[in-house]
C-alpha cells in the first residue's frame, strides 16, 4: 500500500488542510470523551512545527445536511484544542470561499456536514475544499470507509493529497496483522449477531489459526455444535453458516459458561458446564475454565486481533471472561491490535491500553478493512500517489 505521507513532505509556508475525526460526544457544551482529539494532537503539532498554515476539518454528529445546528457545532472542540495547544484556535463558520491563515497558525473549520453536498461527495464542494489548500492531509481513519466531500472528494482535486501520521499508523498496524501475520494468529470476534460480523468471520477464517467467538455469536456456534443455549440470544437461521466457518478454521468453543435467568444488572450469575444449560438460562459470559483455556491459547499466539468483549462486561458479574482475556492479550508477547467501540470500552475498564500494540480508532472502518473491503478515502490516496 503506497500513499504519500505527511511526515515526508516539506510543509513550510504551505496551506495545509487536515481532515481529522473529531466526532466526540458533547454534553452541555463540554467534550465528554477526548480520545479522538488526543489521538489527533500529534498530527496538528507536527504540522505547526513544520511551519504550515494549518486548517482542520471534521464532522460531528448527524445534523441535517446544509443546516447549522448548535448541538452539532465544533465549538466545544475548538475550546478543547485551544487549551491543549496553548493557543487560541478560532472556529471559522464561513470558509468555503477562502480564508486567511498565517504560517504557524491553526484554525478549525465548522462541522463539514453543515455544507450541502458533503455526504454526497459533490464535486463542487470538494473543489472548494481543495482550493483552500496546497496540501490535503487525510488523517481520519474512522471515516475512511465513507466517500464524502471532506474525506474523498477533496483528495481527488487537491494539488497534493497525503496520509496523516494517525492514518498511516493505522494502515501499517492493520497491514501487519492481516497482510503477513506472525503465526500462530488468533482472532477474537464477539458481538450479539453473526449476521453483522459475517464478512469479518469469513475473512478471518481464511487468515487466522484460531478464531475465538464470544457473545451472541458464540451462542450460534454452540447451537451449530449441537449444544443447548436455553433462551440465549442466537440466530437459528445462521447455524449452517456457523458450521461452514467452523469447517474452515479452528473455533474453540466454551466448556463452561456464566448464565442468568434475566438480562439485568441485578441478575444472579451462575457458572455451569455447557451440557447443563437449562431451557430458561441466558448465557451472558464464558466460564472460568473456558477463560483459562482461551487465555493460554492467546499467550502462545504471535498475532492477536481483538474485536468485541466475550460477555456482558458492563455488568461485573458477567465481565470476568472479558477481563481474563484482556489481561492475557496484555501479557502476551504477540503483536496485538484491538478495535471497535465496545472493545475500547473494555480496554479502558481493565486499564490495559498501554499493553496493547495498537488500538484502532475506527469502528466501521476497522471492520471493513478486516473484511478485506476497499476504503474509498485510502484508495484515492493510493491513486494520487501513483500520479
Swiss-Prot record:
Catalytic activity: (2R)-3-phosphoglycerate + ATP = (2R)-3-phospho-glyceroyl phosphate + ADP
GO cellular component: cytosol
Swiss-Prot/TrEMBL keywords: ATP-binding, Cytoplasm, Glycolysis, Kinase, Nucleotide-binding, Transferase
Pathways involved: Carbohydrate degradation; glycolysis; pyruvate from D-glyceraldehyde 3-phosphate: step 2/5
Principal subcellular localization: cytoplasm
Location of this chain's protein in the cell: Cytoplasm
Transferase among keywords: yes
Binding, substrate: 21-23, 36, 59-62, 113, 146
Catalytic activity, EC: 2.7.2.3
Single GO molecular function: ATP binding
PROSITE patterns reported in the protein's UniProt record: PGLYCERATE_KINASE
Residues annotated to bind ATP: 197, 314, 340-343
InterPro entries noted in UniProt: Phosphoglycerate_kinase, Phosphoglycerate_kinase_CS, Phosphoglycerate_kinase_N, Phosphoglycerate_kinase_sf
Single GO biological process annotation from the record: gluconeogenesis
Family from the record: Belongs to the phosphoglycerate kinase family.
Subunit relationships: Monomer.
Stated name of the protein: Phosphoglycerate kinase
Protein source organism: Pseudomonas aeruginosa (strain ATCC 15692 / DSM 22644 / CIP 104116 / JCM 14847 / LMG 12228 / 1C / PRS 101 / PAO1)
